[in-house]
């Protein structure tokens, strides 16, 4: 695992054994930090990015989403969407997540844990190679670009962004495009 301190965030990047190193951890940490900044994430805070394979994502997808088979990215936010600034891509409702406003206070200077992002590098490689990248499933680009997109996408989900309805999706896709340049 490598730890990166950027703009008030601690970003832990962990790569499972056997997972290819498509993009340096420093670049992925900067990708996470850019998405956190764009989403108005609180500081100081911590977030974890786990780079895994299809088998691990399939297990997590079934256990947490009730869906069989692998997926490209899963996010596990620890804050409610209400803890982030309002935006057009904001997830509807707060759901069961607790908020610091609900009575839990951190010690002064402590880092708030934002959540975890788990990406299947195997899925990023397959999607890019088959021309099924870009979240729309029709973009042909390098697997490194697909991985950066998935990291950005997962980070935005941790920060309360969603794509459940057309307006949310348009806002989220627009921000992803701007962040990836």
What are these regions (language model features)?
Residues 1-148, 156-181:
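An acidic/histidine-cluster motif and surrounding catalytic segment
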């Amino acid at each position: 695992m490598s730890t990166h301190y950027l703009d008030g965030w601690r970003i832990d990047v962990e790569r499972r054994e056997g997972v290819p190193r498509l993009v340096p951890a420093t670049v992925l940490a900067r990708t996470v930090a850019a998405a956190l900044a764009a989403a108005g994430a609180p500081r100081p805070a911590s977030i974890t990015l786990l780079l895994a394979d299809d088998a691990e994502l399939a297990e997590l997808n079934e256990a947490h989403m009730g869906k069989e088979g692998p997926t490209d990215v899963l996010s596990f936010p620890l804050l409610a969407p209400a803890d982030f600034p309002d935006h057009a891509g904001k997830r509807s409702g707060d759901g069961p997540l607790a908020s610091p406003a609900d009575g839990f206070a951190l010690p002064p200077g402590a880092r708030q844990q934002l959540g975890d992002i788990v990406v299947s590098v195997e899925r990023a490689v397959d999607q890019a190679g088959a021309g099924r990248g870009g979240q729309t499933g029709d973009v042909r680009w390098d697997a490194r670009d697909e991985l950066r997109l998935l990291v950005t996408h997962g980070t935005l989900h941790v920060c309360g962004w969603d794509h459940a309805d057309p307006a949310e999706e348009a806002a989220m896709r627009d921000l992803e495009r701007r962040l990836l340049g």
